[in-house]
Amino acid sequence: MTTTSEPTVAAPTDSDRIAIAALTQRVVAAWAYHDAKAFASVFTEDGTMILPGVFQQGKAAIEAYMTAAFQGDYQGTQVTGKPLDLRFLGHEGAVLITLGGVLRPGESEVADDEAIRATWTAVKVDGEWWLAAYQNTPRHKKS
């Protein structure tokens, strides 16, 4: 009789979970100060950011995009989100799913039709967690 077993992966540590949560908090803080350089600093050198109609690759491109966005469409805004799911892909990879969105001036909650779901793909490089890819999409299909 042959038995097949699923590969086992050691459970992630609390410090890994905290480090990944810290990535999201660094993004929120960078957004609060409209600091495009700090925003881009959470990404790997070749990290990607996909927003509706937008694709940016690399820290420099992400920083340039966010610099313009903070002076344009995102001027005066904040961003918020809450985790929905966190899964580890071995010891050095994780996927975080969040629900959130952009808060316009005066808003304390994301408008229902503006809410997004986001996927954060994190990788551990030399013992430190980085954002390799970020993508968001509207929570509801717009008619």
Indicate residue ranges for each PLM-predicted region.
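Short, low-complexity N-terminal intrinsically disordered segments enriched in polar/charged residues
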Residues: 1-45, 143
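Short beta-strand edge/turn micro-motifs at domain boundaries
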Residues: 2, 115-143
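A solvent-exposed, acidic/Ser-Thr-rich amphipathic alpha-helical stretch
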Residues: 16-23, 36-92, 99, 111-113
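Feature marks short, surface-exposed loop/turn motifs that line or immediately flank catalytic pockets
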Residues: 46, 104, 138-140
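A short, structured loop/turn motif at beta-sheet edges
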Residues: 86-94, 122-128
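Generic short beta-strand segments
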Residues: 97-104
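A short, polar/proline- and glycine-enriched secondary-structure boundary/capping micro-motif
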Residues: 106-109, 141-143
